[in-house]
Amino acid sequence: ALVTAGSVGQAAAWGFVAHRIVAENAAAAAPPGMVSFYKAANERISAASIEPDSVLKARDQEREKRRHYIDLDELSRPPFRDLPFDEDKARALYGDERVDAAGTLPWRIMTVLGQLRDAFRKKDWEKVVVRSGWLSHYVADAYQPLHTTKNFDGQESCNEGVHAAFETDMIDIGRTAYRASTALPASFTPEVIREPRRFIFAQIIASYDLVDEVLQADTAALAAVKKQRNDYYEEMERRVGVLARQQMSRATATTLNLWYTAWFEAGRPQLPETVPPPAVRADTP
């Protein structure tokens, strides 16, 4: 990839633009019973969606960074049938050091999902807003292929810099088109995810299957630039733009499904039609 100031390591995620698009598109598609609250809270949920990359990483450092990825190939081999989905079982099998090094993304999603469900039960609307944003962030990370592999920045395949090029630069350049093309259709109806941990792992494994396509696109785009045929980002967009849109759209659908799941499991409480003003928060991890 073209190595720029934005090129980053595994601690990074989709860029702020992509995370905001996922959160905002999910809120805009909320179903009856949730729609008024989520539309009113859209801007604040969008702001919360980037807090894991800003506020939480600044506060929690390495502990937060490892919550944004899971290098499946550090723990097992495709198709990962022997990989425990239960965190305690994974730690018993591999040890804490190895699990922490590989990343804890799927279990972080489960933790925040539980926090959101509890916030709905307690009618803590401020926490519902914040955890909705956080959950959208981690869910989106699960759909970024380079968040699932130890070769997260192409450093093992001569694709250094591909991480930021794919998830941030390419999308920032085409942000308007990405926002429109990844919105959920009006016909979309959210569903309760009955086994969220199993579902989340399935999505992450599916994301891993796309890693080679992203790396190959970077290699081809660099070759095209060297031959002065095209701009690097134009080539990346042509080769993996559809893939990026597909993953962002899937992240949006899963985000809304998990919001709906948390609300449903909390007893479908009546949500206010307005959003409380931001509170001074002392959020726990």
What role is predicted for each listed range?
Residues A1-S7:
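Bacterial N-terminal signal peptides
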Residues S7-V130, P145-P285:
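N-terminal, motif-rich segments that launch catalysis or mediate targeting to/interaction with membranes
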Residues V128-S136, A140-A142:
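Short alpha-helix carrying the canonical HExxH Zn2+-binding catalytic motif
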